[in-house]
Structure formats: C-alpha cells, structure tokens
Amino acid sequence: DYGVTADGIVGPETARLLGINLNDQASNDLYLIAKCVYAEARGEPYVGKVAVAAVILNRVEHPDFPNTVYGVVYQPWAFTAVFDGQINLEPDETAYQAAQDALNGWDPTYGCIYYYNPETATSEWIFSREVVVTIGKHNFAI
C-alpha cells in the first residue's frame, strides 16, 4: 500500500514510513535494541523478545554496566549475537515492537540484568545467578 515490500525487515524506507527517524539517538537506541532482540530471541515468544530488550535497558540503568544502549550491547562478551555476527542482521517488525514495548516500560523480567539459555550456556558463572523468571528457552536472572 505504501510502496514497501513486505519482507519482514525494517529498512530505512520502511522506518521512514513508520515514523522512525534513524538519525536521532532515541531511534538509534530503538534500532540497536531491535537488532539485538532479533539476533538473540528470534525463536522466542513475544514476551521473551520484550524481556531481552528489558535486560538491555536494565543494564543501562545498573551501575555495573555501561550507561548507554550501545555500550551495553557492545560490551565485550555480553551478547552472543555480537560475538557471532548475528547482530548485523536486520530486525523484523516484531523485534521493533518488542524493543518499543520495553522502552515504554514493560519489563517482564522484573528488573533482571542477565539471561541465558540453560541448554546452550557454556559459562559456569551464569548458572550462579539467581533465576527470577523463565520465559521461553531463557532464564532471566539477577
């Protein structure tokens, strides 16, 4: 209807039509959170996608982590998707919606700053964290 191909990817033209300005910091944060959500939680239920976004935002507010979305996402070894390059995939509309819901204050993790898949996690340290909630395949912890 708007001359945009429905391919599930929000590129620059689609973002423009959705009213997302990729040139301001809030939009850059939304885009980066959506990229991380898409890369880290593609197969998870919607609430699990929002939860991943919420963890990013909780880290931004936590004194033990960088105080920017960029700093949190690109902190060394913080996210598998950065290490393996999946962060470079273009997010779909659902990832944007999940990121926006978290930015609007929805935190299904109740303040968690960690998450992991217990079936694939390789760091023994992560298993020492107190699990607050499990959503989909991820444990969310403090």
Question: Where are these predicted regions, by residue range?
Answer:
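Short acidic, glycine/serine/threonine-rich helix-capping segments at coil-helix boundaries
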Residues: 1-16
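Bacterial extracytoplasmic/cell-wall-associated proteins, especially those involved in peptidoglycan
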Residues: 25-142
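Intrinsically disordered, low-complexity Ser/Thr-rich linker and spacer segments
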Residues: 12-30
